[in-house]
Amino acid sequence: MVLPSYNGSRKMANLTPLLCMLLVRRGVPVLMHGVTRDPQRLTSAEIFSALGIAHAASGAQAEALMTAGQPAFIPIAALAPSIARLLEMRRILGVRNSTHTLVKIMQPFAQPALRLTSYTHPEYLEMLSDYFGNAAPHDRGDAFLMRGTEGETVANARRAQRIDWFSRGTRTVLVEKQSVAEDVPELPEGSDALATARWINEVLDGRRPVPQAIAEQVDHCVDVAARVRKNIS
């Protein structure tokens, strides 16, 4: 499974690393890629560092981690240096460019995989829906598309977003957009890597419940990832 992380968090907690670790715990090999730092946001890379999980330095190292059943986060600078240089243009121009969208739909594996993708503005929903429905090569695998939680591809712990599943051009709604959850979980501060890491560890240790929206997202990912792998064999 491919899990991009390029937005980070400013106000809400960045729980994309939790999503990754829950999936790995369920036996799904996950390649997570993204930026390591953002001057205005808390990145997944910083949270992994706070968790004591080292970043993969190469594609081969990331593959070894996945084979060993470990979380594999690789910086985009190690995975695709030329794309990383284009992303750096954001700091110069002050706005995101098309590379920011392209990197989120990247599928780096030779074999089919499940991609988690997100959008932040309605026009990107239309564009990405058209791509996955009509243009994306079927042999590259399936994709989930959802409105990002501050841009990230993890479900909003306070309010589940709609998730669309694209498989061989067919679109299926897996999760409908929901109202604010009745039981809103206590979440860590969005800009604090150490507090977020502690909170994630408490969830993984069973001292806190997994937010319902994320638990449901994990279940869907496990199910569809298994279907994709079955089609490979």
What are these regions (language model features)?
Residues 50-53, 61, 66-233:
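Glycine-rich anion-binding loops and their surrounding alpha/beta cores
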